[in-house]
Amino acid sequence: MRRFIITAAVATLAAAALVPPAQARQAIAEPGAETEYVVLYKEGANPAEAQQAIKAAGGSIVKENTAIGLATVTTTNTGFVQAVSGAASIEGSAHNRSIGSVPTARKAAATRAANEVKAVEKAGHGAPAAASTTTSGKPAPAAEPLADLQWDMKQIRATVEGSYRYQQGDRGVLVGVIDTGVDGSHPDIAPNFNSRLSRNFTVDVPVDANGAEVDGPCEAEPDRSCNDPADVDENDHGTHVASSIASPINGLGIAGVAPKVSIVNLRAGQDSGYFFLQPSVDALTYAGDVGIDVVNMSYYIDPWLFNCVDNPADSPADRAEQATVIKATQRALNYAHAKGVTLVGAAGNGGSDYTKEIVDSSSPDFASVPGELPYPRTIPASCVSMPAEGKHVVSVSSTGISKRKAYYSNYGNGYIDIAAPGGDVYDTPANTRDVTKGTLSAYPRALAEERGELNADGTPNVAHVVRSCRGDVCAYYQYLQGTSMASPRAAGVAALIVSRFGLPDRAHGGKKLAPVVVETVLKATATRTACPNPPAYEYTRYLADGSTNITTHVCEGSKLRNGFYGHGIVDALRAVR
C-alpha cells in the first residue's frame, strides 16, 4: 500500500489537512495514556546504564535490540522524552505508536493523500478482464507458461536463453524480503520459501492516535491475533517482491530472476503498509545474524518520508526524532553489511531529483499523539529518506518497457546506483495507460478473492490479475509498477552473483560473498545507459479521466553514471558469465 516505495514520495494534501509545524507537536499524549517509544543508546554505552535511565524516566522496556542498542519502551509519562534524553547513555528517542485508542471511522489526512497517490503502483487496475487471463497447457521447453508476459526479465536477460542457461541460483543463497510478509503457500513461491528462518517482527496496530484505522481490529484477523504468522501477506506487496526474486521454474506461472535461491520472509511492514523503526532494524540485524546474503528493502521508515536533523520547518522535538531514525537505521545497515549482507533498496516514486531541494507535504504520516497531522516542509538535499539513502545501500531506479526511466521514479546523479525494470504503464506509443507494461508477479489468492477480483469459477474478472494452472494447481499473479518492483530484480541479480562467485559459508552453510564484491560486479556488469538527448525528458500521460499530465525530469551525468540510470540497467547474463 502507500507506505511502500511504490507510492508517490511527495504528496499534495488539501489545505484543510495541513497544520503549521508549530502545531504538529503541540498535540501531546493525554496524562495517563500509554505511549510507545523507541530509545537509542549511545554507541559504546553500558546497556545496564541505558536501561536504568529508561526506568528512571518512567519507561518500561518491552523489546531490546542489543546488536545496535535500541529499545522499545512504553510509558505513561508525558515528559518521558525530555527526561530520558538528559541521560549520558541515551542518544535519542522517537515516537513509535500510541496504545489503546478507540477505533473510529475517521481517516488520517496522510491516508487520504495515500489513496490519491497509491495509483502509481496499481495504475490501470480495475479494468475488465481480458479473454486470456487464464493460462494452461505446455510451454516451450524450460520456459514458464507466462514467460512471454515478462518483458522485464527479457530486458535484463534473466531468461531461458540468457542467465538461466548459466546460473539459476543456489539453494544455499538466502534472500531476505523486508516487507509486508510473504505468502509462503503460494504455489510459485512455496518451493523456494525458507519457513525455518522466516520471521515476523511486527505487531498489528489497530488504530493511530487520532483513532483512524491502521491495521484494523485484531479480533478481525483470521487467527484473531495481532501477531501474524511468518508465512502470510495480508497486503500483497511482499509476495510480489519475493516472486520477482525467486519464483521457481516449475511449469507454473512465471520464473524469478534467481529461480533456485531461497526466500526468507523478514516482515517489518504492517498489514496497512506502515514501516516503523524497531521492526525495520530488527529485521536488518537478524539478517546479519542468521547469514542472509541479500536483502531487498522497498519501503521507507515512517513517519518521516525525509529525515532532517536541522530543518527550520521542524520543531526541536521533530528534529531529535528524525535524528534518531537516521542514526538507528544506519547502525542496523552497518551491522548487516559488516555481517556480509548485500543491501538493495528502492529509490522511491515521487518523480523527484533527490539531489535537489523539494517540498514534502506528507510527513509525519502516522499520528503518534492525538491531533498530529502532516505539514508542508521544504526539504534540502541534506535530508535523507531511510533506508534508501543510507550508507551501503544500492539504490535502484525504475525503467519501463522501452528502457526509459519510469515517469514516477525518483532520480539524482549520485543518488541512483543502478536501474532495473519496475514497469511504466504509460510507456506506450500513444502515452496512454496499458496495465501490461507493469511487471507481473505472484499475488495471494486470498486477497484476490477478498477484493472481488475472481469469478465463482476462479477465473479473474479484472485485467491486472492473471491465472496460471498446472493440472489441479492454480496460482494467481498481478501487474504492479514501481521502484518497489525494480529493486527486487536488482536483488535477484545480486543473489545470482553470490551463487556464481560465492565461497562456502562455514558459519551458516550455503555460500557467502562480501557485499563490496557483489556491488562491484552488479555495477560493472550493468548495461551503461546514457541520459536522454536532450537531457530534459518530457513525460506526457493521457489519464483515464481525460486529462493530460506533463512533467519534465532532467538527467545529469555521463553514460558511465548518471541520475536516471546510475551505473546502468542490471544485466543478469553478464553478471554470471
What feature does the model see in each segment?
Residues 1-24:
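Secretory targeting and sorting signals
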Residues 27, 51-149, 404:
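Autoinhibitory propeptides
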Residues 29, 62-63, 291-299, 476-477, ...:
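C-terminal subdomain of the subtilisin-like protease fold in secreted/lumenal serine endopeptidases
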Residues 36-46:
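Short, surface-exposed ligand-recognition loops at beta-strand->loop->(often short) alpha-helix junctions
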Residues 38-39, 63, 72, 92, ...:
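Structural recognition of the beta-strand scaffold that forms the well-ordered cores
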Residues 135, 140-260, 282-324, 349-367, ...:
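Active-site core segment of subtilase-fold serine proteases
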Residues 163-170, 255-258, 274-297, 307-312, ...:
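Mature extracellular/periplasmic domains of secretome proteins
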Residues 204, 369-495, 573-574:
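Extracellular S/T/G-rich loop segment that most often corresponds to the catalytic His/Ser-adjacent loop
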